[in-house]
A protein has these predicted regions:
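N-terminal small/glycine-rich loop or linker at the start of catalytic domains
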Residues: 1-10, 75-86
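Histidine-acidic metal/acid-base catalytic patches
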Residues: 1-34, 68, 96, 100, ...
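Active-site acidic/histidine proton-transfer and metal-coordination neighborhood
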Residues: 23, 65-73, 83-184, 191
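Hydrophobic residues within beta-strands of alpha/beta enzymes
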Residues: 36-38, 75-77, 114, 148, ...
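Glycine-rich, proline-tolerant flexible connector loops at the mouths of alpha/beta enzymes
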Residues: 37-63, 121
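Active-site loop/turn elements of alpha/beta-hydrolase fold enzymes
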Residues: 38-43, 79, 116-119, 153, ...
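A short acidic, helix-capping loop that chelates divalent metal ions and anchors anionic groups
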Residues: 44-49, 83-89, 122-125, 190-193, ...
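Catalytic-core regions built around general acid/base machinery
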Residues: 56-69, 133-141, 205-210, 242-246
């Protein structure tokens, strides 16, 4: 198997924006990554973020120019969310504007797929709610040549229909559009909340193979089943043989993208570069999988 190994450029850094975007990009590339994920969700948490300011396009252009100069490219993104992280006073109208900015940024950076959180609601009309929310964005995404990949949520969110892989497939298929697909977050699938009766739903091989060619993006991370911890593969309890075998069996052909922020955020600064480089080697090891890992 061979997929481009990618990571979020916010991999090491927090949401206080103490380190510039370009410094983050350079450090990740020096760690060995040549493919980058732009997590726009991380950049609408505070009014200090350049993404929410008037010069956002110049900021995006600068990021693309630096990555290209250093021999790297952006190949995946994460959209802002409607029901989650945002700065104080941020309205739904603001989030919609940032969603459009993210799509146009992907077009500028040559990113083919951006990951979206669906509207995870227990409302019986959840399908209509999602269509009403995302149809306007899909229209813009088509114009920009950017695909929308809906992400699976936690297994433990039993009150929300979209916790089920089948419901996620139903949502993606309802658009009947080549610009709509699915993102699989390995950590979310593992989030059974410590309830033994839910463990059966954390079978990565079974769930991933249901997706088939709908799978357009990955969030690779691990946890211990109770907290969405975003740690490195093999530091939690996920069976990585199952994950890699499933990707092989469905013929997955897109990016292998880490969303394992805490693999690098929690180590001392003196070890950060070493940890970033380790994650690239770990990604290379995973995508080279061939019928099992040793011990």
């Amino acid at each position: 198997m061979s997929y481009p190994v990618s990571t979020s450029i916010h991999f090491r850094f927090d949401r206080e924006y103490k380190v510039s975007l370009n410094d983050q990009i350079a450090r990740i590339i020096r760690g060995g990554f040549t493919c980058l994920d732009f997590n726009f969700l991380d950049w609408n948490a505070d009014l200090r973020s350049p993404f929410v300011g008037p010069d956002w396009e110049r900021w995006i252009d600068g990021a693309g120019e630096l990555a290209a100069k250093m021999g790297a490219k952006f190949n995946q993104a994460h959209a802002p969310v409607y029901n989650g992280l945002r700065f104080p006073g941020c309205t739904q109208e603001d989030i919609h504007e940032f969603q459009l900015r993210a799509i146009r940024s992907c077009a500028k950076l040559g990113i083919p797929w951006m990951v979206y959180h669906a509207i995870y609601t227990d409302d019986p009309n959840w399908m209509k709610i999602n269509h009403d929310t995302f149809e306007p964005l899909l229209e813009e995404a088509r114009k920009c040549g950017v695909g929308m990949a809906f992400e699976n949520t936690w297994v433990s969110l039993q009150h929300v229909p979209l916790w089920q892989t089948e419901a996620l497939i139903e949502l993606a298929d309802s658009y009947n559009d080549p610009y709509v697909g699915i993102c699989w977050d390995t950590g979310h699938c593992n989030m059974y909340g410590g309830k033994p009766e839910l463990r059966k739903y954390t079978d990565q091989y079974k769930e991933i193979t249901k997706l088939g060619k709908r799978l357009k993006a990955l969030h690779i991370d691990d946890n211990n089943g109770c907290i969405d911890d975003h740690i490195a593969p093999f530091d939690g309890i996920i069976n990585w043989d199952d994950v890699m075998r499933a990707l092989r069996d469905i013929g997955y052909e897109h990016s292998f993208t880490f969303e394992a922020h805490n693999a690098a955020r929690r180590v001392p600064e003196s070890l950060a570069d070493e940890r970033i480089a380790y994650m690239k080697r770990l990604g290379d090891t995973l995508v080279a999988w061939d019928n099992g890992f040793n011990g």
